[in-house]
Amino acid sequence: MAKNIAKALLDIEAVSLSPNDLFTWSSGIKSPIYCDNRITLGYPEVRNAIRDGLIQLIKEHFSNVEIISGTATAGIPHAAYISEKMELPMNYVRSKSKSHGKQNQIEGAKSENKNVVVVEDLISTGGSSITAVEALEEAGANVLGVVAIFTYGLAKADETFNKAHIPFYTLSDYNELIEVAKDDGKISLNDIQTLVDWRDNLS
C-alpha cells in the first residue's frame, strides 16, 4: 500500500521533488520536496484509496475508536470520508480557538469520555498533530493516536509523538517516495543522495 500511495501522490503532483531547485516552506525551510495533499481531493480514485487505507490503519491499530477527528484544514475532508464510511461521528480541531461566538477550538461531535483518532494529511515535525491532540484531551477525549497520509520521517516527529505518548501511523513515507521516484526514472542516483542528506540534516 505504501508504494501505491507514494506513486499516486507523485503522479498527481501532490508531492513534488526538486533536488536542484529547492522549495521554500512557509516556515522558511529550504526543501527538495513539497507536499500538498489537498490536490488529492480532485482525484476521486486517489482520495478513495487514501480513505480506505486510513480506515485499514484505524481498524488495525485503533479498533475501539468512537470519533474521527480531522485537523483543520487539510485533515478535515479525509476525516469526513472516513467517518462517513465507518459510520462514526466526526469533529475537527482548529489550530486555535475562534475569536468570536463560543470561541470553540473543536467543532462537531462532543469528545468527552470518547475514544478519538486524529486524521492528518501530512506529518513533518508533528507539532500541529499534537496541538490537536492536546485540545481534544483538554476537552476530555481519550486520544488513541494519529493517522496520516504521508510523513517526511523526521526524527523530530518521532520525538514529538513519543514525548506526548501518542502513536502515529501513515500510509506512506519519504523513503518509499524516493524509491518510487527512482523506479519511475524521476530522480537520479545523485538526486537520491541529496534527498537523503536533506532529511538527515534536518533531523
From Swiss-Prot:
Pfam families: Pribosyltran (PF00156)
Keywords for this protein: Glycosyltransferase, Magnesium, Pyrimidine biosynthesis, Transferase
One of the GO biological process terms: pyrimidine nucleobase biosynthetic process
Superkingdom per UniProt: Bacteria
Keyword check for ATP-binding: no
PROSITE patterns listed in its UniProt record: PUR_PYR_PR_TRANSFER
Function field: Catalyzes the transfer of a ribosyl phosphate group from 5-phosphoribose 1-diphosphate to orotate, leading to the formation of orotidine monophosphate (OMP).
Subunit structure: Homodimer.
Family membership noted in the UniProt record: Belongs to the purine/pyrimidine phosphoribosyltransferase family. PyrE subfamily.
Stated name of the protein: Orotate phosphoribosyltransferase
Organism the protein comes from: Staphylococcus epidermidis (strain ATCC 35984 / DSM 28319 / BCRC 17069 / CCUG 31568 / BM 3577 / RP62A)
